[in-house]
Amino acid sequence: MKSMISGISSKIVESKKAKIFLLGTRILWIITTIIYIVLFYFITNKYVSLSEDDIDEYNIKGNEEELLKDDKIFNNYYKSYNKINAICGTFLILLCIVNIISSFYSKLNRGYMLYYKRMIGFVSLHLQLLFIAIMFLQNHENELFFCNINKYIYWFEDYDNKTDLFINSGENLCKVHNYSYIFPACFLFFSLIEFVVLYFKIEKHFRKKFLIFYIKMGTGIMYLALFYIFLKSKSFYNNILSEYNIFTLDDYSDPIKIIIFATQKQKMYYFQLLLVSTVSSAIVFCLLGYFDIYTIMKSCRFSLLVNIPISVFTMIVVFSQLLFSSYILETSAFFCAYEEFIEIHKRDQKASNKMIAPSNITETDWFCNLKSFDYIYFTNISTCLVIFGSDFIVSLYLVFSKKYAPKTS
């Protein structure tokens, strides 16, 4: 009797310690998020503001003091970064508060309310991954732009002798974005703690299935975050870069004209294909992830059985996507070799040494720098293929194994 009482009391103590640890982690997450939003708002704002020395050195007039902030291209990056940090950071804080309330609200531990408490945990984990992925990719997009600012000097030539201001600001912001990866990495670490807590609350025979759900949901979330980046990039390309990409081809040969016109069409196809692929994949994989959660929560054998043909069909679709992604990577490689390709044809046509359509070459360099997102897209597809293959094997085992037959209904 004494051993039973001591065993129960030790479990209560361990439970309290776990709650205190989780509470501390979530409070630390909230504090870290607030620091990230505020700190990087002021740092980025500092580097897009002109100092007194800059105003004197470059003879900046009163109406030009917001030169960097008012520039449409700079505005697209630094403002988007701060907005995303504020929006996603706020939601991360709210999710932490929801998790804190649900863990200490005793009524949620009774009967059917426990089911809803666990669902809150799953949905919260899903949304946390989404906001972290968007913040990470937004930071990466800004890093790609500001760290390659020297390639985009053509866009700032209208400012006469003030292009150095854009270069200096870009180089400083490049360093800022290199360091700011630390915070999304911390958020991901906190999210992994939430995952581990949920993982050990799942019945042992379903833990592998839950791990697969987590990775499957992660790939769906990454597709959704990539959709946001490609949609934003397409809007930037259509509404802002189109104003800068003005040139005439009257003095050039027909082969060069064909290359340039074909490349412009390719840019639109590139975005359209990626947008359709990412949003459709995100929806399908997230829905399949929630189907997995239903299976785990209900310990439903029939759902596991249904999941087997679904996994096979999804693997076929993902494999076709993998083949399609090779076309995307090939297109990206062409954008990166575009200037060299133009130069070869220019020499063949014995054209002048004057640079052909510099605005178009600068724009295509910008497309080339999107290749990092293409590699993330390709890696995500490869991960999906592996994870759905694993899901097929695990579901097959849980359905037909005699060991787990009594544990599923």
Swiss-Prot record:
Regions of this protein lying in the Cytoplasmic compartment: 1-19, 105-118, 201-209, 294-303, 402-409
Residues of this chain annotated as glycosylated in UniProt: N161, N178, N360, N380
TM stretches of this protein: 20-40, 84-104, 119-139, 180-200, 210-230, 273-293, 304-324, 381-401
Disruption phenotype: Repeated attempts to generate a knockout failed. Conditional knockdown results in the arrest of parasite development at the trophozoite stage. Early arrest of gametocyte development.
Record keywords, A-Z: Cell membrane, Glycoprotein, Membrane, Transmembrane, Transmembrane helix
Protein's organism: Plasmodium falciparum (isolate 3D7)
Extracellular side: 41-83, 140-179, 231-272, 325-380
Major localization listed first in the record, in broad terms: membrane
GO CC annotations, alphabetized: plasma membrane
Membrane topology reported for the UniProt record: Multi-pass membrane protein
Protein's name according to its UniProt entry: Plasma membrane resident transporter 1
Subcellular location: Cell membrane
Function statement: Orphan transporter. Required for parasite growth. Required for early gametocytogenesis.
